[in-house]
Amino acid sequence: KILKKQELCKNLVAQGMNGYQHITLPNWVCTAFHESSYNTRATNHNTDGSTDYGILQINSRYWCHDGKTPGSKNACNISCSKLLDDDITDDLKCAKKIAGEAKGLTPWVAWKSKCRGHDLSKFKC
């Protein structure tokens, strides 16, 4: 499912992500846009054999279990397939854990290259 920006915003607010670790909503929205184009079913395979899943491209090496990534930590204690359904609540809970451990959005390559320090006005909720 391709989410509309407003749907994503509503979900982010509901999960208490506005201001979490000092991260503003436009930063979350920008990250989701550049990671997946707001597509809840997005997957991308990495050269290390891991896969990124869902609207925020959560990685199977560390955060979710897909049954095929060697040495997966599954720190969010979730099946990666749950990150591909239309309900993004679990994606956001896991993303919150990731951002909490990193104290920000640095684990997301798209945020570092396309959102950090950029004009985020088009990603306002």
UniProtKB/Swiss-Prot annotation:
Offer a single GO CC term for the protein.
extracellular region
Keywords of this entry: Antimicrobial, Bacteriolytic enzyme, Disulfide bond, Glycosidase, Hydrolase, Milk protein, Secreted
* Miscellaneous field: Lysozyme C is capable of both hydrolysis and transglycosylation; it also shows a slight esterase activity. It acts rapidly on both peptide-substituted and unsubstituted peptidoglycan, and slowly on chitin oligosaccharides.
GO terms for MF: lysozyme activity
* UniProt-annotated location(s): Secreted
Q: Which residues form the active site?
A: 35, 52
Cystine pairs annotated here are 9-125, 30-115, 64-80, 76-94
Q: Mind telling me what this protein is named?
A: Lysozyme C I
Q: What does this protein do?
A: Lysozymes have primarily a bacteriolytic function; those in tissues and body fluids are associated with the monocyte-macrophage system and enhance the activity of immunoagents.
For this chain's UniProt record, which GO biological process terms are given? defense response to Gram-negative bacterium; defense response to Gram-positive bacterium; killing of cells of another organism
UniProt cross-references to PANTHER family, sorted A to Z: LYSOZYME C (PTHR11407:SF28)
Q: Name one Pfam family in it.
A: Lys
Q: Which InterPro entries match?
A: Glyco_hydro_22, Glyco_hydro_22_CS, Glyco_hydro_22_lys, Lysozyme-like_dom_sf
**Tell me, how does this one assemble?**
Monomer.
This chain's source organism reads Tachyglossus aculeatus aculeatus
Q: Return the similarity comment.
A: Belongs to the glycosyl hydrolase 22 family.
Q: Which reaction does it catalyse?
A: Hydrolysis of (1->4)-beta-linkages between N-acetylmuramic acid and N-acetyl-D-glucosamine residues in a peptidoglycan and between N-acetyl-D-glucosamine residues in chitodextrins
Identify which top EC class this enzyme belongs to. Answer: hydrolase
Where in this chain does the record put each C-type lysozyme domain? 1-125
Q: Is Cell membrane a UniProt keyword of this protein?
A: no
The UniProt record lists the EC number as 3.2.1.17
